[in-house]
Structures are given as structure tokens and as C-alpha cells.
């Protein structure tokens, strides 16, 4: 029996691919070359992916992660056997030291972390964030437009090679999942997500994963013109200290699995996107990551936000417990005389913790998930999850209305909707088995119309879910648009059997019940009159 390694413990496919690439940047023969075509000189020899002059020429602020690894491997010399050059930052005590009693009764230089000197990170794990289409983010922003409250979501997609940066990686966003949250005009509070494992299982079936998170910070300037205030800039802040700490916590929850570290993980590819006003006072998207040093400080729980200055963080002075150790943190800056001086991290500017990641949309929009192409199919949209606060509910009438927009041979288009698939696995009425969901997800990934139609005809859980939706949400749809049981009749609102027969068919799920029963033994709904 072969056990499959979970997605969270596997080296990402893009890392496997990039590790096999040469990475050398080819340069054509230039005007200064004085040699035949087949020869090379210093003007046209290939350069390394971490070449500083090339990166500066192309205006690339940070080298890619794999270019950083190549630089470290190259600096060791060809005779070395060192293949794991990455070492994780550590800001907490090393546990289980045999040389002394546990802290605070004992400590030594082996288990004590070094003083942290903050440096701006020269590489980034992700070089670009590409949101597939405009409709994706407009649907996310609709919550703020309708309520005036801020919103947070997880970016769903995958990591792919980014050709514009040597050995680069881009996070491609195909959908946005909105978790349970308490939204306010000036903030957001995460709530417990009881469906987290179920959702991650669905993402694995779809070949996708959480690649980052997005939140809004929008303040209306003129509602008639649709403008928003420009609040995040070089004279204020780009990410607040509290947001940096949250980003670091999420990055620590989504480590970057790599074979180049003895710990088998180093940093994270998890990105942060902020939707806020830009110079033109329109909503724009800005991408970031926090540095590995920041993530290590947050993991050690030594970093906290300041009260009135969002651009400053603060290293704790008082331990949270007797066993909590706080290491010293310092950073260098120029004083009023232009000299480099070391400063204590109480407080420290969050700009030392940030790594910019460009975010945008492609010229040609792409749709991993869509809702048909006709005007009719766009008249009803399947509601986004966890939007009860603004009156948008999934299931019931919404499920009926959305399903009625598609004919029986358009079930593939109906199912190619992330929020619809999410509802199938998270609804509390009918639990659809993993086997059936895997079959549907495979059809969606391959865009296999025949398999999708077979699924709609054969999956009894889907039939029961639709029956309950009609019972709870009302039915006014054409019977031809309602799913059909193979070799049976369409679902209808009335019983096809009477009380005088030996059995009666439930008008909601078509299950045959004994005549003596007053309710259906399958779905529990009462017999129709």
C-alpha cells in the first residue's frame, strides 16, 4: 500500500521544475562582440540568475528564491558536498538542551538565540501575484460596497513559473474564499472556521491551494464618483504592524517545503494583498510578504504592535511567562549626521520587515472558474459563503435560481464555480461523499462535459440536496430544468402515490415509503397532500 504525502508536506511542483532549470540568462551577440557567431566573449556570455548588474538593469528589486539558493550553492565551491545551505532564523530558545535545566533555571550559548540584527531581505519567495480576472476581485469588493465594512478572504490558486524574473515564481489567483469573520467599518476579526479541513480537502481535489490572503482598507471619498481615500503611501504606512504580525502568523502556518534546508522548510510563499485607494483615488491592489526574520520573531511571540503609530512595531519588554525568552533586536539607521548607528527594536519601523510583491491582472483575463457565457447565465449568481450579514444566503432559493439558469447539458458550466463547489462540501443538509466530489472535481479540472452530466444524473446526494432546496426555498422553476433521476421522473412538488396504496413516493426525494408513514424515512419531510 502506497501512502500519498499530504499536499502541505510535499515540495511544490513549481519548485521541482525550477530546481531542474539551468537558470543561466542567455545574452545575444552585441555590437561590442568581435568574434564569430559560435563563439562567446565577456559581452555575451550567459550570466547567473543572481547577477546584480542584470537585476539592476531590469529594475528587479529582489532576486528570486531559487536564484538566492543558486548563489548560496555557488559560493561554497564545486568541491563541497553542502547541498542544504538554507538555515532558518531562530528567535526562541532551542528546546531540550541536555547541558542544563530548562529555562529560566538554566541557559547556555547553544540554546540561546543570537541577537537579531534586522536587514532588508534581498530575495523573495514569490515574485508576482497575478489575479486571473477583474470579476474575481469585484465580487470580493461587493461586500464592502454593500455594507461599508471591511472584508478579508483567502486567495485560492497555485504557484507557477514567472518568466519575467530569473527562476521566478508567481502566485496565480483563481478564486477568493471568504472565511467566517466579524466585519466592521474599521477592522476585521477572524472567527473559528469549522470547515477548514473540508475546504483544504476540496482544494487538493481541484489541484489548488491557499496562496495568500487579501483584505480591504477602503474609505469612501465620494460615493457619487466612486472614489476612495488614498491612505497608504510612503508618508504614512504600507502595512501596519498589526497586519505584519497577522501576515507572519499566516506565513508560519503555510511553510515553504524545500530540500535545501535541514529542517525541510524555509520561509513561506504565502502572500498578502491589500485592496485600498491609490493616487488616483480608485481601489488598487498591493502585494507584500514579511521577511523570514519577522516570521521568526512572531513565532517566538516577541513582536507586538504599537497603540497609536501603525508604522511602528515593538519588541516585548516583559515575558509572557517564566519560560518565555525575549532576545534582543536591533536595526541600523542613519542619524542626523548621516552616520550609520544601531537602534534598539523598541520601537522598530515595519519597513524593515516588508518585501514588496507586484500584484495585478494579465492583459488577457483567464477564468479557471466561470458561470457560463450567455446573458441568461449571468442573471443569477451563486452567493458567496459567509455573507449572512448582508442577506446573501447559500442554498434554498439561491441554489434553485442558480441551477435554473443552466440546462441539463450545461451542468459543467454550473459546477465550474468555486463557491458552488464549496457549498456542496460544506452544506449541513446533505453530505456528499469524497468519492463523488473527487469525480466532479476531476470533471471540472478537465472540463469534461460528459462526466459532469453523468455526475448530475447519477449522484443521489445531489438529487436529495436539490429536493431539499425546493422544499425549503420554494419551487417555481420549469420541470425541465430540474435534475432527473436516471430511468425515473423529474422531481415535482406533489406525491406520485396516495395514502390508499401500499407505498407512496416522496415528492421531495422520490423515496418509496410505506403507506402507514406520515413523513419520508429518507429526507424526513412530510408527505404531500
UniProtKB/Swiss-Prot annotation:
<dbReference type="GO" id="GO:0044877">
    <property type="term" value="F:protein-containing complex binding"/>
</dbReference>
<dbReference type="GO" id="GO:0008270">
    <property type="term" value="F:zinc ion binding"/>
</dbReference>
<keyword id="KW-0539">Nucleus</keyword>
<dbReference type="GO" id="GO:0043130">
    <property type="term" value="F:ubiquitin binding"/>
</dbReference>
<dbReference type="InterPro" id="IPR037518">
    <property type="entry name" value="MPN"/>
</dbReference>
<dbReference type="InterPro" id="IPR007716">
    <property type="entry name" value="NPL4_Zn-bd_put"/>
</dbReference>
<keyword id="KW-0963">Cytoplasm</keyword>
<dbReference type="Pfam" id="PF05021">
    <property type="entry name" value="NPL4"/>
</dbReference>
<comment type="subunit">
    <text>Forms a complex composed of ubxn-3, ufd-1, npl-4.1 and cdc-48.1; within the complex, interacts with ufd-1 and ubxn-3. Interacts with ufd-1. Interacts with elc-1/elongin C; the interaction may mediate the interaction between the npl-4-ufd-1-cdc-48 complex and the E3 ubiquitin ligase cul-2 complex.</text>
</comment>
<dbReference type="InterPro" id="IPR007717">
    <property type="entry name" value="NPL4_C"/>
</dbReference>
<dbReference type="Pfam" id="PF05020">
    <property type="entry name" value="zf-NPL4"/>
</dbReference>
<protein>
    <recommendedName>
        <fullName>Nuclear protein localization protein 4 homolog 1</fullName>
    </recommendedName>
</protein>
<comment type="similarity">
    <text>Belongs to the NPL4 family.</text>
</comment>
<keyword id="KW-0479">Metal-binding</keyword>
<dbReference type="GO" id="GO:0006511">
    <property type="term" value="P:ubiquitin-dependent protein catabolic process"/>
</dbReference>
<keyword id="KW-0143">Chaperone</keyword>
<dbReference type="GO" id="GO:1900182">
    <property type="term" value="P:positive regulation of protein localization to nucleus"/>
</dbReference>
<feature type="domain" description="MPN">
    <location>
        <begin position="129"/>
        <end position="266"/>
    </location>
</feature>
<dbReference type="InterPro" id="IPR001876">
    <property type="entry name" value="Znf_RanBP2"/>
</dbReference>
<dbReference type="GO" id="GO:0005634">
    <property type="term" value="C:nucleus"/>
</dbReference>
<dbReference type="GO" id="GO:0031625">
    <property type="term" value="F:ubiquitin protein ligase binding"/>
</dbReference>
<keyword id="KW-0862">Zinc</keyword>
<comment type="function">
    <text>In association with ufd-1 and ATPase cdc-48.1 and/or cdc-48.2, involved in the cytoplasmic elimination of misfolded proteins exported from the ER. This pathway, known as ERAD, prevents the activation of the unfolded protein response (UPR) caused by the accumulation of misfolded proteins in the ER.</text>
</comment>
<keyword id="KW-0863">Zinc-finger</keyword>
<dbReference type="GO" id="GO:0034098">
    <property type="term" value="C:VCP-NPL4-UFD1 AAA ATPase complex"/>
</dbReference>
<dbReference type="InterPro" id="IPR016563">
    <property type="entry name" value="Npl4"/>
</dbReference>
<feature type="zinc finger region" description="RanBP2-type">
    <location>
        <begin position="499"/>
        <end position="529"/>
    </location>
</feature>
<dbReference type="InterPro" id="IPR036443">
    <property type="entry name" value="Znf_RanBP2_sf"/>
</dbReference>
Amino acid at each position: 500500500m502506497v501512502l500519498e504525502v499530504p499536499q502541505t508536506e510535499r515540495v511544490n511542483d513549481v519548485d521541482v521544475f525550477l530546481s531542474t532549470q539551468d537558470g543561466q540568462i542567455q545574452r545575444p551577440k552585441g555590437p561590442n562582440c568581435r568574434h564569430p557567431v559560435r563563439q562567446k566573449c565577456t559581452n555575451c556570455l550567459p550570466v547567473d540568475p543572481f547577477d546584480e548588474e542584470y537585476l539592476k538593469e531590469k529594475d528587479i528589486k529582489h532576486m528570486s528564491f531559487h536564484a538566492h539558493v543558486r548563489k548560496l550553492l555557488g559560493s561554497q565551491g564545486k568541491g563541497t558536498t553542502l547541498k542544504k545551505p538554507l538555515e532558518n532564523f531562530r528567535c526562541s530558545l532551542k528546546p531540550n538542551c541536555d547541558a542544563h535545566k530548562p529555562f529560566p533555571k538554566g541557559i547556555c550559548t547553544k540554546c540561546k538565540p543570537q541577537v537579531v540584527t534586522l536587514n532588508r531581505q534581498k530575495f523573495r519567495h514569490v515574485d508576482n501575484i497575478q489575479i486571473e480576472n477583474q470579476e474575481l476581485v469585484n465580487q470580493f469588493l461587493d461586500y464592502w460596497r454593500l455594507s461599508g465594512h471591511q472584508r478579508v478572504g483567502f486567495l485560492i490558486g497555485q504557484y507557477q513559473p514567472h518568466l519575467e524574473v530569473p527562476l521566478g515564481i508567481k502566485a496565480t489567483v483563481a478564486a477568493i474564499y471568504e472565511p467566517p469573520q466579524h466585519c466592521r467599518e474599521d477592522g476585521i476579526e477572524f472567527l473559528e472556521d469549522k470547515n477548514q479541513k473540508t475546504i483544504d480537502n476540496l482544494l487538493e481535489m481541484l489541484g489548488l491551494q491557499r496562496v495568500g490572503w487579501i483584505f480591504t482598507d477602503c474609505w469612501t471619498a465620494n460615493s457619487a464618483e466612486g472614489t476612495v481615500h488614498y491612505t497608504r503611501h510612503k508618508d504614512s504606512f504600507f502595512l501596519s504592524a498589526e497586519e505584519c504580525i497577522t501576515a507572519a502568523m499566516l506565513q508560519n502556518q503555510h511553510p515553504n517545503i524545500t530540500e535545501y534546508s535541514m529542517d525541510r522548510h524555509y520561509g513561506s510563499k504565502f502572500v498578502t494583498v491589500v485592496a485600498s485607494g491609490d493616487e488616483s483615488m480608485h481601489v488598487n491592489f498591493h502585494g507584500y510578504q514579511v521577511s523570514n526574520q519577522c516570521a521568526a520573531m512572531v513565532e517566538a511571540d516577541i513582536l507586538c504592535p504599537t497603540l497609536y503609530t501603525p508604522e511602528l512595531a515593538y519588541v516585548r519588554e516583559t515575558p509572557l511567562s517564566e519560560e518565555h525568552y525575549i532576545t534582543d533586536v536591533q536595526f541600523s539607521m542613519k542619524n542626523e549626521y548621516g552616520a550609520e548607528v544601531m537602534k534598539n527594536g523598541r520601537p522598530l519601523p515595519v519597513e524593515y520587515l516588508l518585501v514588496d510583491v507586484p500584484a495585478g491582472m494579465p492583459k488577457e483575463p483567464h477564468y479557471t472558474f466561470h458561470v457560463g457565457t450567455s446573458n441568461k447565465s449571468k442573471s443569477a449568481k451563486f452567493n458567496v459563503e459567509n455573507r449572512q450579514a448582508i442577506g446573501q444566503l447559500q442554498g434554498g432559493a439561491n441554489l434553485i435560481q442558480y441551477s435554473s439558469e443552466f440546462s441539463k447539458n450545461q451542468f459543467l458550466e454550473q459546477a465550474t464555480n468555486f463557491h458552488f463547489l464549496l457549498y456542496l462540501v460544506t452544506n449541513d443538509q446533505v453530505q456528499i461523499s469524497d468519492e463523488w466530489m473527487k469525480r466532479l472535481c476531476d470533471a471540472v479540472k478537465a472540463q469534461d462535459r460528459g462526466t459532469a452530466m453523468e455526475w448530475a444524473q447519477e449522484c443521489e446526494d445531489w438529487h436529495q440536496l436539490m429536493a431539499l432546496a425546493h422544499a425549503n426555498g420554494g419551487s417555481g422553476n420549469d420541470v425541465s430544468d430540474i435534475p432527473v433521476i436516471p430511468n425515473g421522473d423529474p422531481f415535482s412538488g406533489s406525491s406520485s402515490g396516495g395514502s390508499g396504496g401500499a407505498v407512496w413516493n416522496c415528492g421531495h426525494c422520490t423515496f418509496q415509503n410505506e403507506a402507514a408513514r406520515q413523513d419520508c424515512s429518507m429526507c424526513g419531510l412530510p408527505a404531500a397532500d
